[in-house]
Amino acid sequence: MGPSGSGKTTLLRVLMGLEKAYEGKVSGIPEKRSAVFQEDRLQDFYSALANLRLTLPGIKNETLLHELSLLGLTEADARKPARSLSGGMKRRVALARAMLADGEVLFLDEPFKGLDEKTRTQAIEFVRTHRNGRTLIAVTHDEREAEALGCTILRLEFTDSAALA
């Protein structure tokens, strides 16, 4: 947790191995990782369902449709091209993709951004029920979200060099 500009996303990207730390090194993070980024990273011309199939080929369509329904998405929504989905719908597809993958560590960068209260509650419950004991590292501005996910809360304070408080 921390204010905008405090380095939350940068720290998450360093932990994921997407950026290098200026000092020190990160070790002990398993290779099998799943992530939800602030930008949803869906293939715009594929349907929501096809986006899931790209990274979850071993899961049947019926199962994927059921999982999307737990996030408030209908079968009709799942069959629309990603480019025609709202930002909140894309967010939920990205969340389903990350949670259904077999990553040992789940990295979530503001996973509930842009969701209304009802949908946010559904999404938090989805994460809680699909976590399955995996390590979860989430970035959020909302302390209630962090508490609902059952996370240990670390606060980043912005100084000349961001530090954990």
Locations of the language-model features?
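Conserved H-loop
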Residues: G133-T140
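Hydrophobic anchor residue at the start of the ABC signature
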Residues: L95
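Conserved ABC ATPase signature
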Residues: P81-L85, M89
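ABC-family nucleotide-binding domains
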Residues: D109, D116
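Helix-to-loop junction immediately C-terminal to a conserved catalytic motif
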Residues: M16
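Conserved ABC ATPase "signature" region
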Residues: N61-D77
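Q-loop/switch helix immediately C-terminal to the Walker
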Residues: F45-I59, T63
